[in-house]
C-alpha cells in the first residue's frame, strides 16, 4: 500500500510540473527610490512574484521546455503612498524563439505606468480567476495572459483569442477598483484598451499580420531567406490595411515599438523594389519614425 501511495504521489508531482511550465519569466522588483524601507521585504515580494508567474498553472496545455514563454517583468517602485501602498511602473518584454536559430524576436516591449497596489511584508499573493481581490496579482496575471495570447497568435492564426479573453475578464472584474489602468475613460492607452484592441474585429488584420510575420516569415528565413522576407513584407500590408480602416490604435503602436528596429534590419538586405515598398508602408503607418525607415534605402 505504501508503494502504491508513493507512486501516486510521484505521478501527481509530475502532472503538476508538466502543467506549470508554460512561462519562463525573469521577475525583478526595484525599490531604490523608496527610502527607509526594509529591503528584505522587496526581495520577498520579488520571490513571491517569481513563483506566482512561473509556478502557476495558466493553461490546459503541456508545454515542452523549449516552448515555454520567455518574458521579463520588472516592477519598479517610485513612491510609497502609505505604509502598505505603492506606485510604480511595470516594464514588460515578451520574446519568441525563431525556428532553427538561436535568435529571439521581441513581440512586446512596453512600460505600464499605471501601477498602484497594496502590499504588506509577508502577505500572500492572492489571485482568483473569477473575481478581483488584489491589484498586483491581477495586473501580473493580465500580462501573463497577454503574453500567452501574443505567443499563440504568432504560431497559429488568431490562436491567442482564449488568452486575450482571460485578460479581458480580469479587466471586467477590475471595473470597481480605484487603482488606475483598468477603465476606458482614464486614457486610450491602458490595460482596458489593449484587450479591447486585441479582441476588436476591426484590428484583426494586426493579429493576422503577427502570424504571417512570425510563422511564415521569420520561421522560414533559415531555410529560405528571400521567401521569408517576402512573406514579412506581405504581413506589413495587413498592418497597412488595419491602419487605413482605423488609424492610431494602441495595439498598432505597441507592435511597431517592438518590431521597428527588426524590420529595418530585415529589409536592409532586400531588393530595391521591396525596400521601396516596405519603406512606403512603414512611413504611412508609423509616420513619426519615417526617417528611421529611410535608412533601409541607404543600405
Predicted regions located by residue number:
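Sec-exported extracytoplasmic/periplasmic mature domains
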Residues: 50-58, 149-153, 264, 268
Amino acid at each position: 500500500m505504501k508503494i502504491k501511495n508513493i507512486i501516486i504521489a510521484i505521478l501527481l508531482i509530475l502532472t503538476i510540473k508538466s502543467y506549470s511550465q508554460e512561462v519562463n519569466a525573469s521577475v525583478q522588483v526595484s525599490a531604490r527610490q523608496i527610502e527607509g524601507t526594509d529591503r528584505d521585504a522587496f526581495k520577498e515580494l520579488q520571490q513571491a512574484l517569481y513563483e506566482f508567474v512561473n509556478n502557476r498553472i495558466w493553461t490546459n496545455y503541456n508545454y515542452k521546455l523549449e516552448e515555454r514563454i520567455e518574458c521579463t517583468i520588472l516592477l519598479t517602485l517610485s513612491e510609497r503612498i502609505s505604509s502598505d501602498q505603492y506606485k510604480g511602473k511595470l516594464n514588460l518584454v515578451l520574446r519568441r524563439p525563431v525556428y532553427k536559430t538561436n535568435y529571439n524576436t521581441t513581440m512586446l516591449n512596453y512600460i505600464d505606468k499605471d501601477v498602484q497596489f497594496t502590499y504588506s511584508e509577508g502577505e500572500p499573493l492572492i489571485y482568483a480567476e473569477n473575481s478581483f481581490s488584489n491589484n498586483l496579482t491581477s495586473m501580473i496575471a493580465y500580462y501573463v495572459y497577454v503574453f500567452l495570447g501574443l505567443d499563440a497568435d504568432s504560431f497559429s492564426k488568431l490562436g491567442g483569442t482564449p488568452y486575450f479573453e482571460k485578460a479581458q475578464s480580469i479587466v471586467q472584474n477590475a471595473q470597481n477598483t480605484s487603482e488606475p489602468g483598468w477603465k476606458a475613460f482614464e486614457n486610450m492607452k491602458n490595460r482596458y484598451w489593449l484587450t479591447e484592441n486585441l479582441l476588436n474585429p476591426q484590428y484583426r488584420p494586426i493579429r493576422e499580420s503577427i502570424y504571417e510575420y512570425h510563422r511564415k516569415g521569420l520561421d522560414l528565413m533559415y531555410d529560405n531567406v528571400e521567401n521569408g522576407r517576402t512573406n514579412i513584407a506581405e504581413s506589413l500590408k495587413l498592418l497597412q490595411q488595419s491602419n487605413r480602416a482605423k488609424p492610431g490604435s494602441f495595439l498598432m503602436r505597441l507592435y511597431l515599438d517592438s518590431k521597428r528596429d527588426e524590420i529595418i534590419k530585415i529589409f536592409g538586405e532586400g531588393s530595391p523594389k521591396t525596400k521601396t515598398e516596405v519603406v512606403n508602408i512603414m512611413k504611412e503607418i508609423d509616420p513619426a519614425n519615417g526617417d528611421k525607415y529611410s535608412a533601409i534605402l541607404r543600405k
